[in-house]
């Protein structure tokens, strides 16, 4: 117990000594700092020229500091403007390249269609050329359409009512007389048409024969019958 009490007392004494030493060192530091500050604030008598030079130097330093502070912003703005100006030419160049590519594609398409049109033109030239004449523009065959009149049917249609007339039925007789008048008018018109076509049968025949000799092209391989069908009017 005595040993333990002795050690505690020693520890307390050492701690007090350390605390006193630290406080003395701190006091000395504070005193030295106060002395340094007093030396700083001591006014040294100088002339007017030295005061002006120091003030001018301070002003120049302030100006330089302000300029140095502004310079990075100017550099940044100039760099940003240069980057923007570099971007615009690249976009223009890309647009020009796209337009050139588009024009090349259009030229290729035009050349392709020109070749197709030229091939179609050659095919049209190789096809047989058939010359159309005013006589066969609306007909597939070269023979004109001429009506044929059978006079047998007309005469029989006149004879049948005469045989079947009843003297007792007056109404039927009146109706048949009216029909016969219409038939007579119809027969007269048909006779006129036959007479008209009889005049033009021979010249038409010669024209058709001449057309079949000259219409076909020698390059064509298709063959047509040169014989012509001539209408015939039968009278009995």
Curated annotation (Swiss-Prot):
GO molecular function, one term: protein homodimerization activity
Main location: secreted
A Pfam family annotated for this UniProt entry: Casein
Basic and acidic residues composition-biased segments: 84-93
Cystine pairings recorded for this chain: none
Entry keyword annotation includes Signal: yes
Residues that bear Phosphoserine: 23-25, 28, 47, 80-82, 85, 157, 169
Keyword Acyltransferase: no
Matching InterPro entries: Alpha-s2_casein, Casein, Casein_CS
Localization terms from the record: Secreted
Tissue and organ expression note: Mammary gland specific. Secreted in milk.
Alphabetical keyword list: Milk protein, Phosphoprotein, Secreted, Signal
Signal peptide per UniProt: 1-15
Job description of the protein: Important role in the capacity of milk to transport calcium phosphate.
Family: Belongs to the alpha-casein family.
Protein name: Alpha-S2-casein
Species per Swiss-Prot/TrEMBL record: Equus asinus (Donkey)
